[in-house]
Amino acid sequence: MRPDLSLHTLNPSQSPLMRKIESQMIAAVNNSVNWKSANTRVEFIEENNTSKVYLHDNHIATVGDDFMEIFDGGWQSVTTKSRLNSLINAFCNGVTDGIFQKDFQWYIRDNNVTQDFVNGYIFA
């Protein structure tokens, strides 16, 4: 079972309304179960207690007990960014961490420090 998320706060610049599919995705990661709906899939890997998240069969995140590794899956789309930010809000600090886009370029914000987006970035 993943940590209690009730103490996490959301980034005020993001909508507090989460897509139903994203809520279900987070529940699957939180409950360490396999899950699939439409274009999104969670695969729980029991050997190392991680969950891999896929969008259109492209790996976009790995969530472990104390880290989250993110990828764009080859597509820097609005949907990919939405899935990643939902995961960040659930398993990182949604106030200081996130993915955003400016002038068609993706950026990572980690502890309020901004850098260019890189695949394989780890929030720990």
Give short role names for the model-derived ranges.
Residues 2-124:
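Terminal leader/tail segments of proteins
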